[in-house]
Amino acid sequence: LHYVGGHTHGLQIARVWTRRGWMVLAVDASHYYMNFEDIRPYKTVHHVGDMLEGYRLMAGLADSPKHIIPGHDPLVMERYPAASKEMDGIVVRLDADPLY
Protein backbone atom coordinates (compact mmCIF):
# COMPACT_ATOMS: atom_id res chain seq x y z
CA LEU A 1 0.00 0.00 0.00
CA HIS A 2 1.19 3.50 -0.84
CA TYR A 3 -0.19 6.79 0.47
CA VAL A 4 -1.14 9.21 -2.31
CA GLY A 5 -3.66 11.67 -0.91
CA GLY A 6 -5.49 13.75 -3.47
CA HIS A 7 -9.15 12.80 -3.65
CA THR A 8 -9.38 12.31 0.12
CA HIS A 9 -6.94 12.72 2.96
CA GLY A 10 -5.23 9.40 3.68
CA LEU A 11 -6.02 7.79 0.32
CA GLN A 12 -3.89 4.79 -0.59
CA ILE A 13 -3.20 2.80 -3.75
CA ALA A 14 -2.20 -0.86 -3.94
CA ARG A 15 0.76 -2.23 -5.88
CA VAL A 16 0.32 -5.93 -6.63
CA TRP A 17 2.47 -8.52 -8.39
CA THR A 18 0.72 -10.49 -11.13
CA ARG A 19 1.92 -12.78 -13.89
CA ARG A 20 2.00 -9.63 -16.07
CA GLY A 21 4.26 -7.82 -13.60
CA TRP A 22 3.64 -4.96 -11.20
CA MET A 23 0.15 -3.49 -11.36
CA VAL A 24 -1.33 -0.56 -9.48
CA LEU A 25 -4.93 -0.56 -8.30
CA ALA A 26 -5.59 3.17 -8.29
CA VAL A 27 -8.87 2.95 -6.39
CA ASP A 28 -9.97 6.61 -5.90
CA ALA A 29 -6.57 8.08 -6.80
CA SER A 30 -7.83 7.95 -10.39
CA HIS A 31 -11.47 7.30 -11.14
CA TYR A 32 -10.98 6.99 -14.90
CA TYR A 33 -8.16 6.18 -17.33
CA MET A 34 -8.31 9.74 -18.68
CA ASN A 35 -7.49 11.14 -15.23
CA PHE A 36 -3.95 9.74 -15.13
CA GLU A 37 -3.39 9.28 -18.88
CA ASP A 38 -4.21 12.91 -19.69
CA ILE A 39 -3.21 14.31 -16.27
CA ARG A 40 -6.78 15.53 -15.69
CA PRO A 41 -7.74 15.64 -12.01
CA TYR A 42 -11.44 15.39 -11.32
CA LYS A 43 -13.48 18.01 -9.48
CA THR A 44 -13.93 16.51 -6.03
CA VAL A 45 -10.41 16.76 -4.65
CA HIS A 46 -8.99 17.31 -1.17
CA HIS A 47 -5.58 18.40 -2.53
CA VAL A 48 -4.81 18.77 -6.26
CA GLY A 49 -1.04 18.73 -5.75
CA ASP A 50 -1.23 15.42 -3.89
CA MET A 51 -3.41 14.01 -6.67
CA LEU A 52 -0.91 14.99 -9.36
CA GLU A 53 1.93 13.53 -7.30
CA GLY A 54 -0.17 10.37 -6.97
CA TYR A 55 -0.35 10.08 -10.77
CA ARG A 56 3.46 10.27 -10.91
CA LEU A 57 3.79 7.68 -8.14
CA MET A 58 1.40 5.28 -9.91
CA ALA A 59 3.41 5.58 -13.12
CA GLY A 60 6.59 4.79 -11.23
CA LEU A 61 5.15 1.80 -9.39
CA ALA A 62 3.45 0.14 -12.38
CA ASP A 63 5.36 -1.65 -15.14
CA SER A 64 3.54 0.46 -17.76
CA PRO A 65 0.43 2.62 -18.11
CA LYS A 66 -1.43 -0.57 -19.08
CA HIS A 67 -0.64 -1.85 -15.59
CA ILE A 68 -2.64 0.91 -13.84
CA ILE A 69 -6.29 0.15 -13.08
CA PRO A 70 -8.56 3.11 -12.29
CA GLY A 71 -11.16 2.77 -9.57
CA HIS A 72 -14.43 3.51 -11.40
CA ASP A 73 -13.88 3.37 -15.15
CA PRO A 74 -16.34 1.09 -17.00
CA LEU A 75 -13.63 0.68 -19.66
CA VAL A 76 -11.87 -1.77 -17.31
CA MET A 77 -14.63 -4.26 -18.14
CA GLU A 78 -13.93 -3.79 -21.86
CA ARG A 79 -10.14 -3.78 -21.67
CA TYR A 80 -9.73 -7.05 -19.75
CA PRO A 81 -11.11 -10.54 -20.38
CA ALA A 82 -13.82 -12.05 -18.23
CA ALA A 83 -12.74 -14.32 -15.40
CA SER A 84 -14.91 -17.05 -16.96
CA LYS A 85 -17.73 -17.38 -19.46
CA GLU A 86 -20.23 -17.29 -16.60
CA MET A 87 -18.67 -14.10 -15.20
CA ASP A 88 -18.69 -12.18 -18.49
CA GLY A 89 -19.72 -8.59 -17.81
CA ILE A 90 -19.31 -9.07 -14.05
CA VAL A 91 -15.67 -9.92 -13.23
CA VAL A 92 -12.49 -9.46 -15.27
CA ARG A 93 -8.97 -10.86 -14.91
CA LEU A 94 -6.52 -8.04 -14.33
CA ASP A 95 -3.62 -10.50 -14.42
CA ALA A 96 -4.50 -11.44 -18.01
CA ASP A 97 -3.17 -9.55 -21.01
CA PRO A 98 -5.40 -6.57 -21.84
CA LEU A 99 -7.57 -6.78 -24.93
CA TYR A 100 -6.41 -3.42 -26.31
Residue ranges and their predicted role:
Residues 78-99:
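Short, electropositive alpha-helical surface patch
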Residues 3, 11-80:
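Metallo-beta-lactamase
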Residues 54, 99-100:
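Binuclear metal-dependent phosphoesterase catalytic core
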